[in-house]
């Protein structure tokens, strides 16, 4: 059995993104013709603008989000989902590092 990592078959398909001086980092990719990112939010509070609608799934840890039209942050634990409309924005904060999957709808 070979446990060595294999090189990516198409390295151009992966895009590393760094936001907020490294406070949020993600890797972007396409699957079935749709864009996705998998990332980590470090402890802190961040604002994101959206071009496309987004579905955010928390995959590890906990994120707090203030969605468009809402006055307060709500907690989203691992395994939970929230959606953000296109051409809007949302705030997210983490008390400790948390991981997410973002699907562009």
UniProtKB/Swiss-Prot annotation:
S-S bridge residues: none
InterPro entries, per database record: Ppnp, RmlC-like_jellyroll, RmlC_Cupin_sf
Broadest EC class assigned to this enzyme: transferase
GO molecular function: guanosine phosphorylase activity; purine-nucleoside phosphorylase activity; thymidine phosphorylase activity; uridine phosphorylase activity
Gene Ontology CC annotations of this record: cytosol
Protein keywords: Glycosyltransferase, Transferase
Presence of the UniProt keyword NAD in the record: no
EC numbers, comma separated: 2.4.2.1, 2.4.2.2
Gene3D superfamilies associated with the record: Jelly Rolls
Catalytic activity: a purine D-ribonucleoside + phosphate = a purine nucleobase + alpha-D-ribose 1-phosphate; adenosine + phosphate = alpha-D-ribose 1-phosphate + adenine; cytidine + phosphate = cytosine + alpha-D-ribose 1-phosphate; guanosine + phosphate = alpha-D-ribose 1-phosphate + guanine
Summary of the function given for this chain in its UniProt record: Catalyzes the phosphorolysis of diverse nucleosides, yielding D-ribose 1-phosphate and the respective free bases. Can use uridine, adenosine, guanosine, cytidine, thymidine, inosine and xanthosine as substrates. Also catalyzes the reverse reactions.
Family statement: Belongs to the nucleoside phosphorylase PpnP family.
Protein name: Pyrimidine/purine nucleoside phosphorylase
Gene: ppnP
């Amino acid at each position: 059995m070979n446990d060595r990592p294999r090189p990516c078959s198409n390295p151009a398909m992966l895009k590393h993104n760094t936001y907020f001086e490294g406070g949020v980092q993600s890797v972007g990719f396409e699957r079935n013709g749709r864009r996705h990112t998998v990332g980590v939010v470090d402890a802190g509070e961040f604002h994101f603008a959206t071009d496309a609608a987004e579905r955010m799934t928390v995959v590890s840890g906990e994120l707090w989000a203030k969605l468009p039209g809402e006055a307060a942050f709500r907690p989203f634990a691992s395994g939970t989902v929230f959606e953000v409309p296109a051409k809007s924005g949302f705030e997210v904060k983490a008390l400790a590092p948390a991981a997410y999957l973002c699907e562009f709808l």
